[in-house]
């Protein structure tokens, strides 16, 4: 037994010695060194990957624009050392793949292999945009090409901030022999266009790489990864490009990060300015030496001074300031007496009420004596400042008659309050002139009715602003709080002034004591009146309109409610009639407990403009709830209430009502009869037109009822125009079933302009109704849809009023347009109803335009538009 143990121990020692001898041999040492070098190479590669990631993260934090523009791309700069290692490994891996992909293991880089051009087949120019910018490449034979001129006319100066927000740069190329040329248009964050010439040697390579045809106009929209996003053989509206770009998921993240970018860009004031030069931030591809230097010092990047964090709150505050908008609508009808109407729209949203506290107060404007400016009263000034800015509007000029803005500028505001001193707010010591007192009595009865309430502690300086001429004016709130102090100060001032007059002062003379004696005598009569109801209550809100306006209150769940849209389109056609009857429309959107309010005043020119209401009242949910309770509008449905001047409800409507019936009923009111007699003596009437043809009224006829197919040409002899008319022959049934109306516009000058509207029956019959269009309406329609009168173009407008497609050339086959219409969601519902009723065009007239799917370029042209 012991012999076995000894034998085993000896064998174990022998094996240990053999292993030691083998490891100490020279060949094994070389193999071990090779293994260690391989391990070190792998460790170096992993460290380089970590450095690249650290550099990417530091760049993400330090440069906001680089962060946003790098959403769809990856970093294309790599270390030269890693490239050498990959070159050594390439023979073992086949040597067929791009080294850029071998260096980057991310999914985006793997997917980019099929999209990124090889270094031999693509110009390096595109690499400067990769991962940072989208690119719009415009190719034309020469700069006088019609399509090129049309596209450049669409690139107006006011669109470059929108392009900059989407990180879109442009390359323009002219490829005709003898006229080779081009330019690179880089757009800065301020909307400025930096132009630099394009090397003519790159134009053939770009044409080949982007597969653009020579001798023809063409455009290509490239993603940030240099992948082709969309191809356009014709000029297209920029809104169509925006839709394609905005469908990207990363574009949605850009929108969130760039809130307020467009407003800030337009605020710079240089949008659309073209400057010759090179944009430093978007330089072309760096040489290898530059890239090697940047890779070796990636940790220094966090020391840059760019800090994007403070810019986010500034952009958000600019978007939340637009809490109230005031719009003015021109009059639709007038008489020779220049009767005009003014509409003031005040819209509110309760989610932005906190931004008013950021306004800087102005403490030295209302008072003239520094010692009478209390420190705690300066918080009320932003309220008046915001209100003045909030209700400022600009009214476009009209041909029929001018109409006034329904706002008060700073100069008018100060002047009115300088001459106006409400009796309820008059302090103990006021020394206005007799003329100012007279103005006070006149204006109080008409205009200052809403502002007579006693303010709360949040608005202690309201009375001081209304008493600008006074030196030592105080409001009622201050009287209640500091009654004893006020009496002492008044007695002291009185004694000082009498002492000065007794000494023979020449400044005041003998008039001052008389005025003071009168005021002292009238002082007891000013104190007894009880305080009016506080602001923000329903009684104060209705007092603002009582004896001055008739109200039409409308409640609707949303602004897209069909019944509300029908009622709105109805009353917008009778603006002048509502102004004569002093009608104010209050529209409340939302549920009973969460609503927003909009107020429209319809006034004549001679009427005194209505003062804007306080923002707190328009956003006060309790006030809106009380208003709905007062008139029985507690349900979340469409509802209309009509009141007289006494604010008492006269009529209720649960469905949209014709305004003619409303006007006839208003004319039976006793208060209205007196107005009619006075207006008849003054000759105030609305000019009657056979058919109102304003642009808004014209387009409202088709909204949610018809689709519009607009054809515009310089003249009726245009070849493209005649070809399109030939394609429309025998299409009455197809157009009628799809609820399409054809609008033909011709002429370039206003004297030559004209148009025809063709209405096809929706039951598919072959009868067609035609209406003439005036020259002014043709001009307005072209301006609204941005149609150039010098070129042939066609538009398809949906029932929602938005342009669905644009065709710069005639469509030989209407099947393409029919397929686009049939793909819309609303049209599918119409098709289901028509098929259930058996409504279908005959096959011989149908011309094969069934509900089947057509293939071709146009299908790809509209693919992804989300119609």
UniProtKB/Swiss-Prot annotation:
Skewed-composition ranges (Basic and acidic residues): 288-297, 401-412, 436-451, 484-504, 514-523
Transmembrane segments: none
Signal peptide region: 1-18
Ranges annotated as biased composition (Low complexity): 301-370
An example Gene Ontology biological process: somitogenesis
GO annotations of cellular component type: basement membrane; extracellular region
InterPro entries: DUF4174 (IPR025232)
Basic residues composition-biased segments: 426-435, 471-483
Pfam families documented for this protein: DUF4174
Stretches for region Disordered: 83-121, 282-539
Composition bias, Polar residues: 95-104
Organism: Danio rerio (Zebrafish)
Subunit structure: Binds to various extracellular matrix proteins.
Main localization (coarse): secreted
Protein name (Swiss-Prot/TrEMBL): Coiled-coil domain-containing protein 80
């Amino acid at each position: 037994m012991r012999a076995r143990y000894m034998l085993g121990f000896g064998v174990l020692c022998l094996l240990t010695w053999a292993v030691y001898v083998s490891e100490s041999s020279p060949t094994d040492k070389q193999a071990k060194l090779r293994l260690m070098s391989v391990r070190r190479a792998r460790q170096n590669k992993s460290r380089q990957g970590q450095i690249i990631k650290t550099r990417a993260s530091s760049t993400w934090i330090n440069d906001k624009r680089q962060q946003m523009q790098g959403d769809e791309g990856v970093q294309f700069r790599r270390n030269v050392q890693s490239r050498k290692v990959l070159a050594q490994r390439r023979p073992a891996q086949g040597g067929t793949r791009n080294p850029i992909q071998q260096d980057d293991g991310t999914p985006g880089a793997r997917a980019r292999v099929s999209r990124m051009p090889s270094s031999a087949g693509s110009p390096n120019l595109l690499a400067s945009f990769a991962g940072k910018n989208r690119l719009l490449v415009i190719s034309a034979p020469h700069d006088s090409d019609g399509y090129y001129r049309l596209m450049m006319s669409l690139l107006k100066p006011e669109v470059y901030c929108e392009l900059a927000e989407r990180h879109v740069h442009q390359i323009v190329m002219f490829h005709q022999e003898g006229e080779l040329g081009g330019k690179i248009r880089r757009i800065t964050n301020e909307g400025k266009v930096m132009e630099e010439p394009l090397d003519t040697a790159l134009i053939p390579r770009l044409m080949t790489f982007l597969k653009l045809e020579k001798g023809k106009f063409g455009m290509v929209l490239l993603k940030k990864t240099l992948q082709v996003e969309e191809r356009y053989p014709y000029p297209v509206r920029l809104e169509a490009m925006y839709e394609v770009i905005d469908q990207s998921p990363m574009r949605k993240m850009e929108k969130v990060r760039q809130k307020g970018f467009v407003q800030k860009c337009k605020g710079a004031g240089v949008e659309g300015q073209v400057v010759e030069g090179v944009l430093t931030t978007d330089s072309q591809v760096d040489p290898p030496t530059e890239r090697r230097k940047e890779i070796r010092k990636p940790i220094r990047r966090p020391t840059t001074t760019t800090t994007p964090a403070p810019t986010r709150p500034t952009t958000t505050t600019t978007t939340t300031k637009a809490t109230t908008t005031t719009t003015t609508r021109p009059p639709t009808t007038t008489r020779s007496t220049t009767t005009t109407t003014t509409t003031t729209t005040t819209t509110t949203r309760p989610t932005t009420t906190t931004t008013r506290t950021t306004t800087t107060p102005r403490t030295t404007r209302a008072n003239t004596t520094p010692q009478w400016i209390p420190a705690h009263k300066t918080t009320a000034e932003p309220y008046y400042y915001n209100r003045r800015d909030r209700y400022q509007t600009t009214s476009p000029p009209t041909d029929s008659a001018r109409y006034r803005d329904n706002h008060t500028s700073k100069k008018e505001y100060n002047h009115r309050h300088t001459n106006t001193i409400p009796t309820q707010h008059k302090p103990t010591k006021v020394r206005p002139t007799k003329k100012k007192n007279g103005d006070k009595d006149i204006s109080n009865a008409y205009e200052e009715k809403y502002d007579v309430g006693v303010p709360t502690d949040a608005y202690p300086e309201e009375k001081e602003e209304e008493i600008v001429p006074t030196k030592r004016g105080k409001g009622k709130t201050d009287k209640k709080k500091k009654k004893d102090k006020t009496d002492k100060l008044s007695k002291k001032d009185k004694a000082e002034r009498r002492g000065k007059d007794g000494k023979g002062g020449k400044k005041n003379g003998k008039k001052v004591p008389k005025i003071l004696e009168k005021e002292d005598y009238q002082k007891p009569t000013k104190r007894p009146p009880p305080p009016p109801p506080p602001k923000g209550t329903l009684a104060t809100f209705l007092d603002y309109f009582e004896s001055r306006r008739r109200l039409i209150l409308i409640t609707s769940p949303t602004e897209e409610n069909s019944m509300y849209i029908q009622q709105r389109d109805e009353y917008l056609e009778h603006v002048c009639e509502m102004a004569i009857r002093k009608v104010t429309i209050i529209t409340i959107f939302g549920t009973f407990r969460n609503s927003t309010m909009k107020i429209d005043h319809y006034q004549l020119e001679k009427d005194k403009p209505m003062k804007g209401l306080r923002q707190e009242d328009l956003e006060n949910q309790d006030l809106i709830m009380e208003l709905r309770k007062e008139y029985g509008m507690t349900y979340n449905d469409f509802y209309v209430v009509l009141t007289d001047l006494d604010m008492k409800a006269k009529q209720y409507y649960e469905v949209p009502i014709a305004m003619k019936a409303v006007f006839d009923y208003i004319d039976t009111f006793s208060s209205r009869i007196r107005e009619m007699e006075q207006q008849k003596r003054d000759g105030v009437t609305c000019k009657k037109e056979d058919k109102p043809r304003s642009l808004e009224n014209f387009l409202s006829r088709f909204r949610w009822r018809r689709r519009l197919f607009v054809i515009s040409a310089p003249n009726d002899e245009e070849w493209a125009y005649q070809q399109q008319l030939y394609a429309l022959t025998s299409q009455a049934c197809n157009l009628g079933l799809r609820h399409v109306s054809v609008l033909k516009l011709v002429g370039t000058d206003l004297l030559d302009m004209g148009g025809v509207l063709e209405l096809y029956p929706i039951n598919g019959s072959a009868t067609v109704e035609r209406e003439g269009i005036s020259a002014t309406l043709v001009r307005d329609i072209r301006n609204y849809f941005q149609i150039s009168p010098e070129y042939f173009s066609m538009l398809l407008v949906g029932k929602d009023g938005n342009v669905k497609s644009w065709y710069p050339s005639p469509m030989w086959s209407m099947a393409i347009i029919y397929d686009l219409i049939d793909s819309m969601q609303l049209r599918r519902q119409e098709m289901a109803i028509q098929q259930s009723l058996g409504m279908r065009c005959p096959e011989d007239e149908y011309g094969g335009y069934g509900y089947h799917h057509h293939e071709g370029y146009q299908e790809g042209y509209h693919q992804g538009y989300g119609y």
